[in-house]
């Protein structure tokens, strides 16, 4: 459930509010297609920072950079999306200015869906 997802792992799972329709999740600044789900309606989508990447042919996110943390082997790029903090683990050489809009890709196969009300995994 989202309670466990929010504190297990470092960084914790990213949780984004939105809706799903026809296998496509849509939220503010986020669109992820190809989800294996027949659900329709409000959901919470979860993904791990290490499963996402900066750039890509069909980016899922276009949002301004909120912060960056250099870790030595990687750079953690944080976005503020619809009031939530979302993180992507980028290459160690990636650099962007705070406030600069950056595209990121979140693969559908690595996403988890949760009930928007109860927080239980779907």
What are the roles of these predicted feature ranges?
Residues 11-15, 22-122:
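Non-catalytic connector elements of ABC transporters
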Residues 1-9, 13:
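Conserved beta-strand-loop-alpha-helix hinge in the C-terminal portion
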